[in-house]
């Protein structure tokens, strides 16, 4: 949960003037804990089962094929401004099934992120939070790296 909390706080606090690097985020742990426990957000998973370790991609892809319409409906109900996909199969599903391809923008050099133009929804590829990557790597080299690039892209588009 700590990785989720850091990421949630970073995504909501980062802007063109404040990049909220990992070292800054961890200084505010009590604030982050309160924020995480009181702010609305969703962690959408597919085929989540207790116990066990890893779910094979083949099984996950089959589950997405069988029940993807329910996941799409859940995301439509939530109408998020950001979707963080924990793993390749979920990201592939999101960018290929949620929105028409012609409405998605890829920022050059950032295949791990898409912008849905009509809703402004950002879709990110992320490591799964249970990945053995350190909290710092999970935070700085994943979603936050691409989000900062998106903010730069936004600034360029406004000029």
Please report, for each region that a protein language model flagged, where it lies by residue:
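A polyanion-binding, active-site-adjacent surface
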Residues: 1-78, 82, 88-93, 131-132
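C-terminal capping/extension of enzyme domains
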Residues: 57-72, 92-159
């Amino acid at each position: 949960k700590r990785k989720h909390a850091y990421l949630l706080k970073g995504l909501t606090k980062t802007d063109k003037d404040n990049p909220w690097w990992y070292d800054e985020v961890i200084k505010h742990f009590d604030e982050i804990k309160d924020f995480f426990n009181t702010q609305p957000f969703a962690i959408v998973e597919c085929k989540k089962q207790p116990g066990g370790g890893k779910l094979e991609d083949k099984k996950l892809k089959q589950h997405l094929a069988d029940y993807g319409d329910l996941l799409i409906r859940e995301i439509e109900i939530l109408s998020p401004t950001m979707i963080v996909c924990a793993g390749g199969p979920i990201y592939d599903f999101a960018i290929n099934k949620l929105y028409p391809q012609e409405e998605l923008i890829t920022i050059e050099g950032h295949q791990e992120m898409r912008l849905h133009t009509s809703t402004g929804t950002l879709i990110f590829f992320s490591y799964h939070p249970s990945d053995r990557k350190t909290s710092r790597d999970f935070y700085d080299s994943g979603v936050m790296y691409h989000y900062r690039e998106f903010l730069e892209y936004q600034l360029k588009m406004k000029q």
